[in-house]
UniProtKB/Swiss-Prot annotation:
Residues 520-692 are annotated as: Flexible hinge. Belongs to the SMC family. SMC6 subfamily. This is Structural maintenance of chromosomes protein 6. Its main location: nucleus. Residues 51-60 have a biased composition (Basic and acidic residues). Pfam families: SMC_N. The lineage of its organism: Eukaryota, Metazoa, Chordata, Craniata, Vertebrata. Residues 63-80 have a biased composition (Polar residues). Core component of the SMC5-SMC6 complex, a complex involved in repair of DNA double-strand breaks by homologous recombination. The complex may promote sister chromatid homologous recombination by recruiting the SMC1-SMC3 cohesin complex to double-strand breaks. The complex is required for telomere maintenance via recombination and mediates sumoylation of shelterin complex (telosome) components.
């Protein structure tokens, strides 16, 4: 067998024919999987053409491949002539009508074989085809090999020498630099081969070896591109049928052979598929038969073998028990190792909690110191404030006394000034008045004065009554306004509670179908988003929540207490890690764009509840929050233990009993706080009342809650209506009283208006008196004394005014100081309040941190105890293992590795014992049954293997053929494009224009050519051309095919038979040019023309044939209808 240039083996053509008949492996899988289709079935040629076909998917790629191929030829032509496959010489004896021709020694590049008709040119070409294994029908000179033997002779002999040099030589160590193919033809139609080395030694006489050589050299004698006879040219090239031209192209490029190969493969696949179907039915029958034979075979199994098997099973049983014990110990050891690895984690948690406790205690001390400092400041400011307040009160008293004294002196001054004026008037009147006033005038004045005083008294009484009425109505209006403000506040509270109850009622109605609506309108959407994210794998562990939805009450009366205890934790969610927390935060930001979001707690998920027995509180009559609840998930329980310490909080229904237990007596151990049935929070030294009066989240009877809320809504509606009526009534009373008050104020003003003229009249009447009997001098003395008193009083007024101003200044200063200290005390109180809240929060934080630390300390203790317990269990199991090993060694000293369980072995031992007992009773023809069973099993396995193999082969073949056919189409396109390029280029050398049209669908090829300039006339079909022009176009077509097909030599018979001198000259130049560019190929051109005009060059060799013998006009060829040759 030959090898390719890369060293891989090449299957001879005879082997390829065999492979067609074998369905199992008709193609080399590696070649099909890695390369495209090739021109022929020959592996050597496929390898060469594959280089040109790879990656040829676009027109630009084809152009690149053409230019690349041209550059390769130029490179090859410059490097020298071909080393392998070219024909060095041909020798003929008794062939056709020639006794002896040759030997003809051909040059490595261009060879012209010239001679007259009948000189033997075509005989040489025919001998080349036949001598290299071609069929007689290919030559078109006969249908049988025996027709080539010269008439009158018994045999004919053909000897062809091929070059075998260079690195691509075929078995150079065996054949040397040349291979001589010697073939002997006999008249009985047989032929024999001799393959000789360069030394003349016969190496082989097998045709397979010749086929391997041809494959290696890529020689295709049946390819019209390699060897084109006159008859082939007439049939295909000169034919006017476009289908014939297309067939010629397909045959020349070996695409036809590939297409036939593909069709044959698909037919083979179809037949194989039918065989598989038939084999499947046959396989089922064989399987059933095999099962039946196997059952009979098992039923008569040798007792000795069964007993041996029984002993073997007993040995395995002994060591299986050992293996199972070892397997039981292994997880304990691994668990101990794992648990010991987790010890560090608990210690780290304890250290972390200790650090948090220290930090929290430092915060507590800092807040306590801050509060103490504020308290000391407040205590220090309090006496100062009291002193300043007393000082203000004293100064205000002094100022008020000085103001009273000042007003008294001022009134005294006004009285004295009025008296002085009256004395002055009196003296003047006395001086001017006469002593003749009558008694009747005096009495009349006195009577008028009395009447005026009576009227004044009535007006004074009326003024007093009016003042009393004004005071009463002012107080009534103030009371009404206070009542109205109180009603407004209660009305707003009722309205707020009314809206809250309506919202709760709506949530309760919705919770009848979706309980989660109790936790807010957004909660169902949030949980749906969490479920969706969990399905998409965005959480490591799905968050749990809301926590309130995961808890249930054992006693419904404790609902308000539990809700007051857990508060915001009822809405919280728990995450296993911070990555899940961030994802949940993102989801919440979408579902809760505004307002408060539920709290997220990060706590590692574990599948069991903490053991809190050591730190939990206990009371015989009252449960803790933990024991009062039924919780769905251990993660929720652990979260509430960590965040709220529910194991340390009691629920005591009664208020008084709660105070008694928590404050008047020592509370139970580990109890920090308690909650009453009404939701009040009770500490050892504090008591906080609950704002809520009813549970909203944990209530179980929704209908009762709805009924209760509807009743309260009706009550609130009634209360709202009552308050609105009262408000309207009060507003009306206020309006009426304010109207009456305005009337009394107007009446008071009118009284003052009425009094003023009366006072003036009485003053006037009192000044008109009788002339007194006293002396005017006395009145003047009184006036002088009165003036002195006025001066003294004025001095007292000034002193009182000055003193009052000084006291006012002192009072203002004292009030400013007092206001400042009040502001300081108020600011200290304001600062102290948030500090107290922070102190309470930090206190809770300290307690939580200590509780966490205690929790992890207890967990560490439990963890270490668990490890110790596991170690003790392992030690006990290891002792048991030692006992089992010693027992197993007594049964079977050497250990057996057993993969089965002891239980399955025990079952089989019992079954085998029963079978042995039954077989000891029954006997049969054991040998025949065993033989039948083995035969049936072999048949079944053989058919099963073949069916499986064929199924795999069909599947692989489908995949390969799909890829190969795609590559075949791409390769055909590449060859078509390259052929068009070369054809157009060759025509242009004669100034012709033309094109080749390929129709692969209809399998036609049309050539249109226009002699002369292409733009002067339309393209014409070759039928319109002259004989010389048509021959020239045909040569261009041939040369185009030469450019795309691979073969070491080309043979062309009478290519210029119909050409004129000009076209012959141009065609010759084109062939020589191509030969010069392809020096690695050999060209053998047969022509009857005289080649004396050829240029003298070392590349061209002319072989002239002798003229035929006189009288010889025809060659003794046999008719085509004679019997076909025997290929073997």
């Amino acid at each position: 067998m030959g090898k390719r240039k890369d060293g891989s083996p090449i299957a001879p053509s005879s082997q390829r024919k065999k492979q067609r008949q074998e369905v199992d492996d008709p193609y080399d899988e590696e070649d099909y999987g890695q390369a495209g289709p090739s021109v022929s079935n020959d592996y050597g040629q496929r390898k060469k053409q594959r280089k040109e076909a790879d990656n040829s998917h676009t027109d630009s790629d084809y152009e690149n491949s053409v230019s690349c191929a041209s550059s390769q030829r130029v490179s090859a032509s410059q490097s020298g002539t071909g080393d392998v496959g070219i024909i060095e010489s041909i020798f003929l004896r008794n062939f056709m009508c020639h006794s002896m021709l040759g030997p003809f020694r051909f040059g490595p590049n261009v060879n012209f074989v010239i001679g007259n008709n009948g000189s033997g040119k075509s005989a040489v070409l025919t001998a080349l085809i036949v001598g290299l294994g071609g069929k007689a029908a290919i030559t078109n000179r006969g249908s049988s090999i025996k027709g080539f033997v010269k008439e009158g002779q018994t045999f004919a002999e053909i000897s062809i020498t091929l070059r075998n040099r260079g690195q691509d030589a075929y078995k150079p160590d065996v054949f040397g630099n040349s291979i001589t193919v010697q073939q002997r033809l006999t008249t009985d139609g047989s032929r024999t081969y001799k393959l000789k080395s360069a030394t003349g030694a016969v190496v082989s006489n097998k045709k397979e070896e010749l086929t391997a050589i041809l494959d290696h050299f890529n020689i295709q004698v049946d390819n019209p591109v390699s060897v084109l006879t006159q008859e082939m040219s007439k049939h295909f090239l000169q034919s006017k049928n476009e289908s014939d031209k297309y067939k010629f192209f397909m045959k020349a490029t070996q695409l036809e052979q590939m297409k036939e190969d593909y069709s044959y493969i698909m037919e083979t696949k179809s037949r194989t598929h039918d065989q598989v179907e038939n084999g499947g039915e046959r396989l089922r029958d064989l399987r059933q038969e095999c099962i039946q034979k196997e059952e009979r075979f098992k039923s008569i199994a040798s007792l000795g073998e069964m007993k041996e098997k029984l002993e073997d099973l007993k040995n395995k049983m002994a060591w299986a028990l050992v293996t199972e014990s070892e397997k039981q110990i292994k997880p304990f050891i691994e668990q101990i190792s794992t648990e010991e690895g987790r010890t560090v984690k608990y210690e780290q948690k304890i250290e972390e909690c200790q650090g948090k406790v220290i930090n929290a205690e430092e915060k507590f001390r800092a807040k306590q110191e801050e509060l103490d400092k504020i308290t000391q400041e407040a205590v220090a400011l309090k006496p100062q404030g009291i002193g300043l307040k007393e000082d203000v009160q004293k100064k205000r008293k002094s100022y008020n006394e000085s103001e009273v004294l000042y007003n008294r002196h001022r009134m005294e001054l006004k009285r004295l000034e009025r008296d002085a004026e009256q004395l002055h008037k009196r003296i003047e009147e006395l001086k001017k008045s006469a002593d003749n006033d009558s008694e009747s005038e005096k009495m009349a004045r006195q009577k008028e004065i009395n009447q005026i005083r009576e009227r004044m008294k009535a007006l004074h009484d009326k003024d007093i009554t009016t003042n009393q009425q004004i005071h009463q109505f002012q107080q009534a209006i103030e009371k009404y306004k206070e009542e109205r403000a109180r009603i407004g506040n209660e009305e707003r509270n009722i309205k707020q509670r009314l809206e809250q109850h309506k919202r709760q009622l709506k949530e309760l109605h919705e919770s009848k179908t979706d309980r989660l609506k109790r936790f807010g309108q957004n909660m169902p959407a949030l949980l749906a988003a969490i479920d969706e994210a969990d399905k998409l794998g965005r959480f490591r562990k799905k968050p749990v929540g809301p926590l309130g939805a995961c808890i249930h009450l054992k006693d419904q009366e404790l609902a308000l207490a539990v809700e007051s205890c857990l508060k915001g934790l009822m809405f919280a969610f728990c995450c296993d890690n911070h990555q899940d927390e961030r994802m949940l935060q993102n989801i919440m930001s979408r579902e809760y764009p505004r307002g408060r979001r539920p709290q997220i707690i990060v706590n590692e998920f574990i599948d069991h509840v903490y053991d809190v027995r050591q730190r939990a509180t206990f009371h015989p009559d009252h449960p803790t929050v933990l024991t009062a609840l039924e919780i769905d998930h251990p993660v929720v329980t652990n979260c509430l233990i960590d965040m709220r310490g529910i194991e340390t909080i009691l629920i005591i229904k009664g208020k008084d009993e709660a105070r008694e237990i928590m404050q008047k007596r020592a509370p139970p151990r580990n109890c920090r706080e308690a909650f009453t049935g009404e939701g009040d929070q009770v500490y050892t030294n504090r008591y906080y009342s609950s704002d809520s009066r009813r549970a909203t989240l944990l209530s179980r009877d929704v209908e009762a809650e709805i009924s209760h809320l509807e009743k309260e809504l009706r009550n609130f509606g009634s209360q709202m209506a009552t308050f609105q009526q009262r408000a309207q009534s009060v507003d009306k009373d206020i309006k009426e009283n304010e109207g009456i008050l305005r009337q009394y104020h107007n009446s008071k003003k009118q009284i003052q208006i009425d009094l003023r003229p009366l006072l003036e009249r009485i003053s006037e009447l009192e000044n008109v008196e009788e002339q007194p009997s006293i002396d005017i001098a006395t009145l003047e003395g009184e006036a002088e004394e009165n003036l002195n008193k006025i001066e003294l009083v004025k001095q007292e007024v000034e002193l009182a005014k000055e003193k009052m101003g000084n006291l006012k200044s002192f009072l203002t200063t004292a009030e400013i100081n007092y206001e400042e200290i009040k502001k300081k005390i108020s600011s200290v109180a304001e600062v102290a309040e948030p500090v107290k809240e922070d102190l309470h929060r930090v206190d809770q934080e300290v307690e939580n941190c200590k509780r966490h630390r205690k929790h992890y300390e207890e967990k560490l203790k439990e963890h270490l105890d668990r490890i110790q317990k596991r170690k003790e269990e392992v030690a006990a199991k290891e002792q048991e293992l030692e006992v089992k090993i010693s027992q197993a060694k007594c049964i079977c000293p050497e250990r057996i590795e057993v993969s089965r369980t002891a239980r399955s072995l025990d079952t089989e031992i019992n079954r085998l014992r029963e079978k042995i007992n039954s077989e000891e009773v029954l006997h049969g023809n054991r040998e025949e049954i065993i033989k039948q069973y083995h035969e049936a099993k072999e048949r079944y396995q053989d058919v099963e293997g073949k069916v499986k193999h064929l199924k795999r082969f069909i599947k692989l073949l489908d995949e390969i053929m799909a890829q190969r056919y795609k590559s075949y189409q791409q390769f055909r396109r590449c060859l078509t494009f390259r052929c068009k390029i070369y054809f157009d280029s060759l025509l242009s050398q004669r100034a012709y224009s033309g094109k080749i049209n390929f129709d692969h669908k209809n399998e036609t090829l049309s050539i249109t050519v226009q002699p002369g300039e292409g733009n002067k006339a339309a393209l014409s079909d070759m039928k319109c051309l002259s004989g010389g022009e048509r021959s020239f176009s045909t040569v261009c077509f041939i040369l185009s095919l030469w450019s795309i097909a691979e073969s070491p030599f080309r043979c062309l018979d009478e290519f210029d038979v119909y050409m004129d001198m000009v076209n012959r000259r141009i065609s010759m130049d084109m062939m020589l040019s191509m030969a010069d560019s392809q020096r690695f190929r050999q060209f053998i051109l047969l022509t009857p023309q005289n080649m004396s005009s050829l240029p003298s060059t070392s590349l061209v060799r002319i072989l002239r044939m002798k003229d035929p013998e006189r009288g010889q006009t025809t060659l003794p060829f046999q008719p085509l209808n004679q019997e076909a040759e025997d290929e073997e």
